[in-house]
Amino acid sequence: MKKLRSYYSNVRHHQNHHHHHHHHSNIVSSERKWIFFPLLIGSIFALFLLFLTTTLTSPTGGVRFLPFTRPVLLTGSGSSAFVESKIKPQQISSLPSPPRFAYLISGSAGDGKSLRRTLLALYHPNNRYVVHLDRESSREEREELHGYIKNSSLFRRFMNVHMIEKANLVTYRGPTMVANTLHAAAILLREGADWDWFINLSSSDYPLVTQDDLLHIFSHLPRDLNFIDHTSNIGWKASQRAKPVIIDPGLYLNKKSDVFWVTQRRSIPTAFKLFTGSAWMALSRPFVDYCIWGWDNLPRTVLMYYSNFLSSPEGYFHTVLCNAEEFRNTTVNSDLHFISWDNPPKQHPHHLTLTDMTKMVNSNAPFARKFRREDPVLDKIDDELLNRGPGMITPGGWCIGSHENGSDPCAVIGDTDVIRPGPGARRLENLVTSLLSTENFRSKQCK
Protein backbone atom coordinates (compact mmCIF):
# COMPACT_ATOMS: atom_id res chain seq x y z
CA MET A 1 0.00 0.00 0.00
CA LYS A 2 1.04 3.55 -0.67
CA LYS A 3 4.38 4.37 0.95
CA LEU A 4 3.97 1.99 3.87
CA ARG A 5 6.19 -0.72 2.43
CA SER A 6 9.05 1.72 1.96
CA TYR A 7 8.52 2.95 5.52
CA TYR A 8 8.48 -0.67 6.68
CA SER A 9 11.88 -1.22 5.10
CA ASN A 10 13.14 2.07 6.48
CA VAL A 11 11.99 1.24 10.01
CA ARG A 12 13.58 -2.19 9.92
CA HIS A 13 16.83 -0.79 8.59
CA HIS A 14 16.94 1.81 11.35
CA GLN A 15 16.34 -0.76 14.03
CA ASN A 16 19.44 -2.60 12.89
CA HIS A 17 21.54 0.49 12.13
CA HIS A 18 21.28 3.52 14.38
CA HIS A 19 22.96 5.80 11.81
CA HIS A 20 21.33 5.74 8.44
CA HIS A 21 20.67 8.39 5.79
CA HIS A 22 17.06 8.57 4.56
CA HIS A 23 16.26 7.79 0.97
CA HIS A 24 13.05 7.33 -0.98
CA SER A 25 12.53 4.01 -2.67
CA ASN A 26 10.60 3.57 -5.88
CA ILE A 27 9.14 0.39 -4.48
CA VAL A 28 5.39 0.77 -4.17
CA SER A 29 3.53 -1.76 -2.10
CA SER A 30 0.13 -2.81 -3.30
CA GLU A 31 -2.72 -2.48 -0.88
CA ARG A 32 -5.18 -5.19 -0.13
CA LYS A 33 -7.64 -4.65 -2.91
CA TRP A 34 -10.59 -2.31 -2.28
CA ILE A 35 -13.50 -4.28 -3.62
CA PHE A 36 -15.04 -2.39 -6.52
CA PHE A 37 -15.85 -4.06 -9.85
CA PRO A 38 -13.95 -2.45 -12.74
CA LEU A 39 -15.89 -0.10 -14.95
CA LEU A 40 -13.66 -0.37 -18.02
CA ILE A 41 -14.03 -4.05 -18.74
CA GLY A 42 -12.13 -3.71 -22.01
CA SER A 43 -8.85 -2.67 -20.43
CA ILE A 44 -6.12 -5.11 -19.48
CA PHE A 45 -5.98 -3.75 -15.96
CA ALA A 46 -9.70 -4.27 -15.49
CA LEU A 47 -9.36 -7.88 -16.62
CA PHE A 48 -6.52 -8.34 -14.17
CA LEU A 49 -8.59 -6.91 -11.34
CA LEU A 50 -11.50 -9.12 -12.28
CA PHE A 51 -9.18 -12.13 -12.20
CA LEU A 52 -7.85 -11.03 -8.83
CA THR A 53 -11.27 -10.53 -7.26
CA THR A 54 -12.60 -13.83 -8.56
CA THR A 55 -9.62 -15.84 -7.32
CA LEU A 56 -8.72 -14.14 -4.06
CA THR A 57 -11.98 -12.86 -2.60
CA SER A 58 -14.81 -14.51 -0.80
CA PRO A 59 -18.36 -14.54 -2.13
CA THR A 60 -19.13 -11.65 0.23
CA GLY A 61 -16.55 -9.39 -1.34
CA GLY A 62 -13.98 -9.50 1.44
CA VAL A 63 -10.32 -10.16 0.90
CA ARG A 64 -8.94 -13.56 1.83
CA PHE A 65 -5.69 -13.43 3.75
CA LEU A 66 -3.23 -15.92 2.35
CA PRO A 67 -0.42 -17.53 4.36
CA PHE A 68 2.36 -15.19 3.30
CA THR A 69 4.03 -12.55 5.42
CA ARG A 70 5.25 -10.15 2.72
CA PRO A 71 3.07 -7.42 1.24
CA VAL A 72 2.55 -7.54 -2.52
CA LEU A 73 5.11 -5.45 -4.34
CA LEU A 74 4.25 -3.78 -7.61
CA THR A 75 7.79 -3.70 -8.91
CA GLY A 76 9.27 -3.45 -12.35
CA SER A 77 12.08 -2.03 -14.42
CA GLY A 78 11.79 0.76 -16.93
CA SER A 79 9.87 3.98 -16.71
CA SER A 80 6.43 2.89 -17.85
CA ALA A 81 3.66 4.94 -16.30
CA PHE A 82 1.19 2.07 -16.54
CA VAL A 83 0.70 -0.12 -13.51
CA GLU A 84 0.04 -3.17 -15.72
CA SER A 85 3.69 -3.27 -16.73
CA LYS A 86 4.77 -3.36 -13.08
CA ILE A 87 2.57 -6.22 -11.92
CA LYS A 88 4.20 -9.58 -11.44
CA PRO A 89 1.38 -12.16 -11.50
CA GLN A 90 3.35 -14.66 -9.45
CA GLN A 91 3.23 -12.23 -6.51
CA ILE A 92 -0.55 -11.92 -6.43
CA SER A 93 -0.85 -14.17 -3.38
CA SER A 94 1.90 -12.48 -1.36
CA LEU A 95 -0.46 -10.69 1.02
CA PRO A 96 0.82 -9.84 4.50
CA SER A 97 -0.57 -11.95 7.30
CA PRO A 98 -3.16 -10.22 9.47
CA PRO A 99 -2.12 -9.02 12.91
CA ARG A 100 -4.17 -9.65 16.01
CA PHE A 101 -4.96 -7.13 18.71
CA ALA A 102 -5.33 -7.69 22.44
CA TYR A 103 -7.58 -5.13 24.09
CA LEU A 104 -8.07 -4.10 27.69
CA ILE A 105 -11.37 -2.24 28.16
CA SER A 106 -11.77 -0.94 31.70
CA GLY A 107 -14.50 0.90 33.56
CA SER A 108 -15.82 1.84 36.97
CA ALA A 109 -19.19 2.25 38.68
CA GLY A 110 -22.02 2.76 36.19
CA ASP A 111 -19.86 1.95 33.16
CA GLY A 112 -21.15 -1.58 32.49
CA LYS A 113 -23.39 -0.71 29.53
CA SER A 114 -20.83 1.66 28.00
CA LEU A 115 -18.14 -1.00 28.32
CA ARG A 116 -20.39 -3.53 26.60
CA ARG A 117 -21.05 -1.10 23.74
CA THR A 118 -17.34 -0.39 23.27
CA LEU A 119 -16.63 -4.14 23.29
CA LEU A 120 -19.22 -4.78 20.57
CA ALA A 121 -17.88 -1.91 18.46
CA LEU A 122 -14.33 -3.35 18.75
CA TYR A 123 -15.09 -7.05 18.45
CA HIS A 124 -13.38 -9.36 15.96
CA PRO A 125 -13.11 -13.15 16.38
CA ASN A 126 -9.34 -13.18 15.88
CA ASN A 127 -8.60 -10.59 18.57
CA ARG A 128 -8.43 -11.04 22.35
CA TYR A 129 -10.30 -8.97 24.93
CA VAL A 130 -9.95 -8.45 28.66
CA VAL A 131 -12.70 -6.40 30.32
CA HIS A 132 -12.61 -5.03 33.86
CA LEU A 133 -15.08 -3.15 36.03
CA ASP A 134 -13.21 -1.98 39.12
CA ARG A 135 -14.31 -2.58 42.68
CA GLU A 136 -16.16 0.73 42.88
CA SER A 137 -18.80 -0.82 40.63
CA SER A 138 -21.51 -2.86 42.31
CA ARG A 139 -21.45 -6.62 42.45
CA GLU A 140 -24.75 -6.61 40.51
CA GLU A 141 -23.24 -4.53 37.70
CA ARG A 142 -20.22 -6.81 37.44
CA GLU A 143 -22.40 -9.93 37.49
CA GLU A 144 -24.63 -8.50 34.78
CA LEU A 145 -21.63 -7.89 32.50
CA HIS A 146 -20.17 -11.30 33.30
CA GLY A 147 -23.50 -12.96 32.52
CA TYR A 148 -23.75 -11.12 29.21
CA ILE A 149 -20.28 -12.31 28.17
CA LYS A 150 -20.85 -15.87 29.40
CA ASN A 151 -24.20 -16.18 27.62
CA SER A 152 -23.08 -14.73 24.28
CA SER A 153 -22.99 -17.56 21.75
CA LEU A 154 -20.42 -15.63 19.70
CA PHE A 155 -18.06 -15.07 22.63
CA ARG A 156 -18.50 -18.70 23.69
CA ARG A 157 -17.66 -19.90 20.21
CA PHE A 158 -14.37 -18.02 19.95
CA MET A 159 -13.49 -17.94 23.67
CA ASN A 160 -11.70 -14.64 23.25
CA VAL A 161 -13.38 -12.37 25.82
CA HIS A 162 -12.09 -12.64 29.39
CA MET A 163 -13.64 -10.73 32.28
CA ILE A 164 -11.54 -10.13 35.40
CA GLU A 165 -14.06 -11.43 37.93
CA LYS A 166 -12.05 -10.59 41.04
CA ALA A 167 -12.25 -6.83 40.53
CA ASN A 168 -9.22 -4.68 41.30
CA LEU A 169 -9.40 -1.57 43.43
CA VAL A 170 -8.30 1.20 41.08
CA THR A 171 -7.53 4.71 42.30
CA TYR A 172 -7.76 7.46 39.73
CA ARG A 173 -4.30 8.96 39.05
CA GLY A 174 -2.70 6.27 41.22
CA PRO A 175 -0.31 3.38 40.49
CA THR A 176 -3.19 0.92 40.90
CA MET A 177 -4.21 1.97 37.37
CA VAL A 178 -0.82 0.79 36.10
CA ALA A 179 -1.14 -2.41 38.14
CA ASN A 180 -4.52 -3.09 36.53
CA THR A 181 -3.07 -2.62 33.04
CA LEU A 182 -0.17 -4.98 33.83
CA HIS A 183 -2.65 -7.48 35.28
CA ALA A 184 -4.61 -7.56 32.02
CA ALA A 185 -1.41 -7.88 29.99
CA ALA A 186 -0.31 -10.82 32.14
CA ILE A 187 -3.66 -12.57 31.59
CA LEU A 188 -3.31 -12.12 27.83
CA LEU A 189 0.24 -13.50 27.87
CA ARG A 190 -0.75 -16.46 30.05
CA GLU A 191 -3.51 -17.42 27.62
CA GLY A 192 -0.77 -17.85 25.05
CA ALA A 193 -2.84 -16.90 22.01
CA ASP A 194 -1.20 -15.14 19.09
CA TRP A 195 -1.53 -11.37 19.31
CA ASP A 196 0.71 -8.56 18.16
CA TRP A 197 -0.39 -5.34 19.86
CA PHE A 198 -1.85 -4.63 23.30
CA ILE A 199 -4.27 -1.67 23.27
CA ASN A 200 -5.66 -0.21 26.50
CA LEU A 201 -8.98 1.61 26.36
CA SER A 202 -11.69 2.69 28.77
CA SER A 203 -15.45 2.46 28.53
CA SER A 204 -15.48 6.15 27.51
CA ASP A 205 -13.37 5.39 24.41
CA TYR A 206 -14.89 4.50 21.05
CA PRO A 207 -13.48 3.41 17.68
CA LEU A 208 -13.68 5.64 14.60
CA VAL A 209 -12.70 2.83 12.22
CA THR A 210 -13.70 -0.82 11.93
CA GLN A 211 -11.46 -3.67 13.03
CA ASP A 212 -11.13 -4.62 9.36
CA ASP A 213 -9.74 -1.15 8.67
CA LEU A 214 -7.28 -1.48 11.54
CA LEU A 215 -6.22 -5.03 10.62
CA HIS A 216 -5.74 -4.04 6.99
CA ILE A 217 -3.42 -1.12 7.72
CA PHE A 218 -1.49 -2.72 10.59
CA SER A 219 -0.81 -5.83 8.51
CA HIS A 220 1.70 -3.71 6.60
CA LEU A 221 3.59 -2.52 9.68
CA PRO A 222 6.49 -4.01 11.66
CA ARG A 223 5.02 -5.88 14.61
CA ASP A 224 7.47 -4.34 17.08
CA LEU A 225 6.33 -0.72 16.72
CA ASN A 226 5.02 0.91 19.92
CA PHE A 227 2.44 3.67 19.49
CA ILE A 228 2.84 5.91 22.54
CA ASP A 229 2.55 9.66 22.92
CA HIS A 230 5.64 10.76 24.88
CA THR A 231 8.12 13.53 25.70
CA SER A 232 10.98 14.10 28.15
CA ASN A 233 10.05 17.78 28.37
CA ILE A 234 8.08 17.35 31.57
CA GLY A 235 7.94 21.09 32.31
CA TRP A 236 5.55 21.88 35.17
CA LYS A 237 5.21 18.17 35.90
CA ALA A 238 8.69 18.21 37.47
CA SER A 239 7.46 20.23 40.44
CA GLN A 240 3.86 18.98 40.54
CA ARG A 241 4.32 15.30 39.64
CA ALA A 242 7.95 14.13 39.90
CA LYS A 243 9.05 15.83 43.13
CA PRO A 244 5.93 15.28 45.28
CA VAL A 245 5.56 11.87 46.91
CA ILE A 246 2.05 10.40 46.93
CA ILE A 247 0.54 7.31 48.51
CA ASP A 248 -2.19 5.28 46.80
CA PRO A 249 -4.36 3.66 49.53
CA GLY A 250 -5.65 1.26 46.89
CA LEU A 251 -2.38 -0.65 47.29
CA TYR A 252 -3.17 -1.71 50.85
CA LEU A 253 -6.79 -0.88 51.81
CA ASN A 254 -10.02 -2.67 50.92
CA LYS A 255 -12.03 0.52 50.54
CA LYS A 256 -11.40 3.10 47.85
CA SER A 257 -10.08 6.53 48.81
CA ASP A 258 -8.11 9.22 47.01
CA VAL A 259 -4.33 9.43 46.87
CA PHE A 260 -2.66 11.60 49.49
CA TRP A 261 0.60 13.51 49.61
CA VAL A 262 3.44 13.21 52.12
CA THR A 263 5.40 16.28 53.19
CA GLN A 264 8.79 15.04 52.03
CA ARG A 265 9.73 15.80 48.41
CA ARG A 266 12.27 13.97 46.28
CA SER A 267 14.70 14.92 43.54
CA ILE A 268 14.40 14.13 39.84
CA PRO A 269 15.79 10.63 39.09
CA THR A 270 19.33 10.25 37.77
CA ALA A 271 19.21 6.44 37.34
CA PHE A 272 16.81 6.88 34.41
CA LYS A 273 15.26 9.71 32.43
CA LEU A 274 11.61 10.58 33.01
CA PHE A 275 9.16 10.61 30.12
CA THR A 276 5.50 11.54 30.18
CA GLY A 277 2.55 11.48 27.79
CA SER A 278 -0.86 9.99 27.13
CA ALA A 279 -2.15 7.09 29.23
CA TRP A 280 -3.57 5.41 26.08
CA MET A 281 -1.27 3.38 23.85
CA ALA A 282 -0.77 0.41 21.53
CA LEU A 283 2.21 -1.62 22.75
CA SER A 284 3.99 -4.40 20.88
CA ARG A 285 3.97 -7.91 22.26
CA PRO A 286 7.78 -7.99 22.68
CA PHE A 287 7.62 -4.86 24.82
CA VAL A 288 4.70 -6.18 26.89
CA ASP A 289 6.71 -9.38 27.44
CA TYR A 290 9.62 -7.24 28.61
CA CYS A 291 7.45 -5.30 31.08
CA ILE A 292 5.79 -8.40 32.55
CA TRP A 293 8.80 -10.70 32.77
CA GLY A 294 11.38 -8.02 33.60
CA TRP A 295 14.46 -10.05 32.65
CA ASP A 296 16.23 -6.70 32.78
CA ASN A 297 15.44 -5.00 36.10
CA LEU A 298 14.43 -1.67 34.56
CA PRO A 299 10.64 -2.34 34.29
CA ARG A 300 10.55 -3.52 37.90
CA THR A 301 12.65 -0.63 39.26
CA VAL A 302 10.65 1.99 37.38
CA LEU A 303 7.37 0.42 38.53
CA MET A 304 8.44 0.71 42.16
CA TYR A 305 9.48 4.33 41.60
CA TYR A 306 6.12 5.18 40.02
CA SER A 307 4.19 3.72 42.96
CA ASN A 308 4.63 7.15 44.60
CA PHE A 309 4.13 9.23 41.45
CA LEU A 310 0.93 11.17 40.73
CA SER A 311 -0.74 10.13 37.44
CA SER A 312 1.68 7.24 36.95
CA PRO A 313 -0.29 5.87 33.93
CA GLU A 314 0.99 8.94 32.05
CA GLY A 315 4.62 8.05 32.69
CA TYR A 316 5.38 4.43 33.55
CA PHE A 317 5.37 2.75 30.13
CA HIS A 318 6.85 5.86 28.50
CA THR A 319 9.82 5.90 30.88
CA VAL A 320 10.49 2.16 30.57
CA LEU A 321 10.24 2.25 26.78
CA CYS A 322 12.56 5.20 26.28
CA ASN A 323 15.17 4.00 28.79
CA ALA A 324 15.35 0.48 27.36
CA GLU A 325 17.97 0.38 24.62
CA GLU A 326 16.36 -2.50 22.76
CA PHE A 327 12.99 -0.71 22.50
CA ARG A 328 13.62 3.03 22.32
CA ASN A 329 13.95 2.91 18.53
CA THR A 330 10.52 1.28 18.15
CA THR A 331 8.42 4.23 19.33
CA VAL A 332 5.87 6.04 17.19
CA ASN A 333 4.93 9.29 18.94
CA SER A 334 1.14 8.97 18.90
CA ASP A 335 -1.60 7.55 21.11
CA LEU A 336 -3.80 6.87 18.05
CA HIS A 337 -6.58 8.92 19.67
CA PHE A 338 -8.56 12.03 18.95
CA ILE A 339 -8.83 13.88 22.27
CA SER A 340 -10.09 17.45 22.67
CA TRP A 341 -8.00 19.27 25.29
CA ASP A 342 -8.01 22.77 26.68
CA ASN A 343 -4.89 24.81 25.98
CA PRO A 344 -3.02 24.38 28.25
CA PRO A 345 -4.51 20.96 29.06
CA LYS A 346 -6.52 20.48 32.23
CA GLN A 347 -6.86 17.24 34.17
CA HIS A 348 -9.77 16.06 32.00
CA PRO A 349 -10.38 16.47 28.26
CA HIS A 350 -13.64 17.78 26.82
CA HIS A 351 -16.50 15.36 26.36
CA LEU A 352 -16.99 14.82 22.63
CA THR A 353 -20.38 15.57 21.07
CA LEU A 354 -22.02 15.81 17.64
CA THR A 355 -20.26 19.14 17.06
CA ASP A 356 -16.91 17.30 17.16
CA MET A 357 -17.82 14.75 14.48
CA THR A 358 -16.03 16.45 11.57
CA LYS A 359 -12.90 17.06 13.63
CA MET A 360 -12.85 13.44 14.75
CA VAL A 361 -13.09 12.13 11.20
CA ASN A 362 -10.52 14.59 9.87
CA SER A 363 -8.03 13.59 12.59
CA ASN A 364 -7.69 10.17 10.87
CA ALA A 365 -7.35 8.64 14.36
CA PRO A 366 -8.70 5.11 14.91
CA PHE A 367 -9.98 5.93 18.44
CA ALA A 368 -11.49 8.89 20.25
CA ARG A 369 -12.30 9.86 23.83
CA LYS A 370 -13.96 11.00 26.06
CA PHE A 371 -17.62 10.22 25.42
CA ARG A 372 -20.52 10.53 27.83
CA ARG A 373 -22.59 7.40 28.25
CA GLU A 374 -25.03 6.93 25.36
CA ASP A 375 -24.21 10.30 23.80
CA PRO A 376 -25.98 10.76 20.41
CA VAL A 377 -22.60 11.14 18.70
CA LEU A 378 -21.97 7.44 19.33
CA ASP A 379 -25.05 6.58 17.26
CA LYS A 380 -23.73 8.80 14.48
CA ILE A 381 -20.35 7.06 14.59
CA ASP A 382 -22.10 3.68 14.46
CA ASP A 383 -24.20 4.73 11.49
CA GLU A 384 -21.70 6.69 9.41
CA LEU A 385 -18.30 5.18 10.25
CA LEU A 386 -18.84 1.64 11.55
CA ASN A 387 -22.03 0.53 9.76
CA ARG A 388 -23.07 -0.92 13.11
CA GLY A 389 -26.68 -1.58 14.05
CA PRO A 390 -28.04 -0.91 17.56
CA GLY A 391 -26.79 -3.53 20.01
CA MET A 392 -24.87 -5.35 17.28
CA ILE A 393 -21.22 -6.05 16.56
CA THR A 394 -19.41 -3.89 14.02
CA PRO A 395 -19.65 -6.02 10.84
CA GLY A 396 -16.51 -7.23 9.10
CA GLY A 397 -15.58 -9.52 6.24
CA TRP A 398 -16.26 -12.50 8.50
CA CYS A 399 -19.96 -11.54 8.81
CA ILE A 400 -21.86 -13.08 5.90
CA GLY A 401 -25.47 -12.75 7.05
CA SER A 402 -28.08 -10.39 5.65
CA HIS A 403 -28.40 -6.69 6.52
CA GLU A 404 -32.04 -6.64 5.45
CA ASN A 405 -34.82 -5.56 7.82
CA GLY A 406 -32.35 -4.72 10.57
CA SER A 407 -30.85 -8.21 10.65
CA ASP A 408 -27.44 -8.75 12.23
CA PRO A 409 -24.99 -9.77 9.46
CA CYS A 410 -22.66 -11.26 12.08
CA ALA A 411 -25.32 -13.80 13.06
CA VAL A 412 -23.90 -15.87 10.19
CA ILE A 413 -20.16 -16.44 10.56
CA GLY A 414 -17.90 -16.90 7.58
CA ASP A 415 -14.13 -17.09 7.24
CA THR A 416 -12.59 -15.03 10.04
CA ASP A 417 -9.47 -14.36 7.96
CA VAL A 418 -11.50 -12.42 5.39
CA ILE A 419 -11.47 -8.67 5.90
CA ARG A 420 -13.29 -5.91 4.09
CA PRO A 421 -11.58 -2.54 4.62
CA GLY A 422 -13.68 0.57 4.13
CA PRO A 423 -13.13 4.34 4.03
CA GLY A 424 -11.70 4.25 7.56
CA ALA A 425 -8.67 2.36 6.23
CA ARG A 426 -7.95 5.24 3.85
CA ARG A 427 -8.00 7.69 6.73
CA LEU A 428 -5.85 5.45 8.91
CA GLU A 429 -3.37 4.98 6.07
CA ASN A 430 -2.98 8.76 5.89
CA LEU A 431 -2.31 8.93 9.63
CA VAL A 432 0.25 6.10 9.66
CA THR A 433 2.00 7.45 6.56
CA SER A 434 2.36 10.80 8.31
CA LEU A 435 3.54 9.26 11.59
CA LEU A 436 6.20 7.20 9.81
CA SER A 437 7.38 10.03 7.57
CA THR A 438 10.95 11.30 7.73
CA GLU A 439 9.94 14.46 9.56
CA ASN A 440 7.77 12.72 12.19
CA PHE A 441 9.23 9.29 12.92
CA ARG A 442 12.90 9.27 14.00
CA SER A 443 12.95 12.92 14.97
CA LYS A 444 10.23 12.40 17.60
CA GLN A 445 11.46 9.21 19.22
CA CYS A 446 12.16 9.52 22.95
CA LYS A 447 13.04 13.21 22.71
From Swiss-Prot:
One of its GO terms (cellular component) is Golgi apparatus. It is a single-pass type II membrane protein. PANTHER family: BETA-GLUCURONOSYLTRANSFERASE GLCAT14A, GLYCOSYLTRANSFERASE. Disruption phenotype: Increased cell elongation in hypocotyls and roots from seedlings grown in the dark. This is Beta-glucuronosyltransferase GlcAT14A. It is an enzyme of class 2 (transferase). GO terms for biological process: unidimensional cell growth. It comes from Arabidopsis thaliana (Mouse-ear cress). Its EC number is 2.4.1.-. The gene is GLCAT14A. Pfam families: Branch. Residues 1-33 are cytoplasmic.
